[in-house]
Amino acid sequence: MEGSDFLLAGVLFLFAAVAAVPLASRLGIGAVLGYLLAGIAIGPWGLGFISDVDEILHFSELGVVFLMFIIGLELNPSKLWQLRRSIFGVGAAQVLLSAALLAGLLMLTHFSWQAAVVGGIGLAMSSTAMALQLMREKGMNRSESGQLGFSVLLFQDLAVIPALALVPLLAGSADEHFDWMKIGMKVLAFVGMLIGGRYLLRPVFRFIAASGVREVFTAATLLLVLGSALFMDALGLSMALGTFIAGVLLAESEYRHELETAIDPFKGLLLGLFFISVGMSLNLGVLYTHLLWVVISVVVLVAVKILVLYLLARLYGVRSSERMQFAGVLSQGGEFAFVLFSTASSQRLFQGDQMALLLVTVTLSMMTTPLLMKLVDKWLSRQFNGPEEEDEKPWVNDDKPQVIVVGFGRFGQVIGRLLMANKMRITVLERDISAVNLMRKYGYKVYYGDATQVDLLRSAGAEAAESIVITCNEPEDTMKLVEICQQHFPHLHILARARGRVEAHELLQAGVTQFSRETFSSALELGRKTLVTLGMHPHQAQRAQLHFRRLDMRMLRELIPMHADTVQISRAREARRELEEIFQREMQQERRQLDGWDEFE
């Protein structure tokens, strides 16, 4: 692709994302499906703006690579060891059972047994990018089903190695392409990467961090991610697996959070590019000429994988309420199928349109997953949001709550317990199934679902409630919920959790004045205790705390118009200096007033 063409493609991708994703979110079909539809629109079978899909699809795999690096950072080696049973037990069983069933079905449709085996293995894999994205959107990350889903995806990445090695054997060209010496060298190189990463990465990042230049740290992070991806690609292994291992090696380092911050913007954009590329690769010509075959194939693929995953989840002991989430989120074909089927095609394992039909099936199955997860959400909502069971003893029998609490993590639980202790009627909205199960056992009135859905808020009693307390983890969810409440339930008093100063500014701009910055109050309290240990009078330390809180809040309000304007940063610094001067002046006055206090104690 020429340089100018590459730039044009970049502009088209950005335009497609900016136009399609907000529209998809407004229609309630999710960002992932929006990216896929945008790819269809600008691809060779849509408006035809971009024709070189294969090159862009390979480049867009970097989105999955960055995502796996961040996931690796969140898992330390001891946690990975704890997951070994689910990785090599459930993960291996899912791949083998799904591949066997799907290969058998392909043989019934005139595939040779060699092509059927490759097709079955490729179709058994799930989309790492899509599954992890949906798990995050649905709040499954910390649930049992989310942990099990991640284990299955990790085993699938490990299975890439033997699957690719199997292709030349099935094609009957093992002598020509299957070099055991070369494989041994690759294994040694892989082990060398593990050992080198274990002992070299932290000293290298310590040296880079000592420079104090943030841009260099970001560049080093990108070098690590891209370098490990290219190294694994050169070995013929999964790029995503390489960056995942790099992330795990740095999971216990002091640079973990800084690495996440440096990578996050690139991950989001490249993941969007990946989904757009998948949409572009959909061959509408094959879909048109083999419509019935493709539709049946997609239905059978999704049904077989759901059946296998559901049964494995049941055998593993996953709660019944979480099994459908686990099965649904992994029910699609994956990006690895594109690589495996291309390799098999180069070995002439497929005949006629077989490869094109398989790729169309995989692509369409990926498009069904967001819709399938919405159906699962509706089913779970009916199951959990219906009338209370007789054996449950809720604290409150009144159907009209005074307060709705959105999110029941550590922050929300403290608020909920305080309100319950004072006999307030509350209803909790939570999208983590495991949390819903636990809270209901303790008698909380909990609704499962996405609180940004107006119907759920209405059924939870928002029209009769007096206040809503928003404790969402994601700032985007908080602001969306504020907008919905102001539009549909204007009578509600909105109280919100702000994760930081930027979110506090956004809440103030939206008209929300009752909010709490999650670390501010506790930091101030610890600061007050520190002043006392340094010899300051307790009353004086208390006054210092109150002054600081009041003046900081005043500065927060004064800087609302410029919080997002980088040109105004200098003004923020001036305001901070002013705050310090006012603080020192008032504290000097306090000291004069307190000079004689100690002698009376």
From Swiss-Prot:
InterPro entries: Cation/H_exchanger_TM, K/H_exchanger, K_H_efflux_KefB, Na+/solute_symporter_sf, NAD(P)-bd_dom_sf, RCK_N. PROSITE patterns: RCK_N. Its main location: membrane. Residues 400-519 form the RCK N-terminal domain. The chain crosses the membrane at residues 4-24, 29-49, 55-75, 87-107, 115-135, 152-172, 177-197, 207-227, 230-250, 268-288, 291-311, 324-344, 356-376. SUPFAM superfamilies: NAD(P)-binding Rossmann-fold domains. Keywords: Antiport, Cell inner membrane, Cell membrane, Ion transport, Membrane, Potassium, Potassium transport, Transmembrane, Transmembrane helix, Transport. It comes from the Bacteria. One of its GO terms (biological process) is proton transmembrane transport. GO terms for molecular function: glutathione-regulated potassium exporter activity. It is a multi-pass membrane protein. GO terms for cellular component: plasma membrane. It is found in: Cell inner membrane. Interacts with the regulatory subunit KefG. HAMAP family: K_H_efflux_KefB (MF_01412). PANTHER family: K(+) EFFLUX ANTIPORTER 3, CHLOROPLASTIC. Belongs to the monovalent cation:proton antiporter 2 (CPA2) transporter (TC 2.A.37) family. KefB subfamily. This is Glutathione-regulated potassium-efflux system protein KefB. The lineage of its organism: Bacteria, Pseudomonadati, Pseudomonadota, Gammaproteobacteria, Enterobacterales.
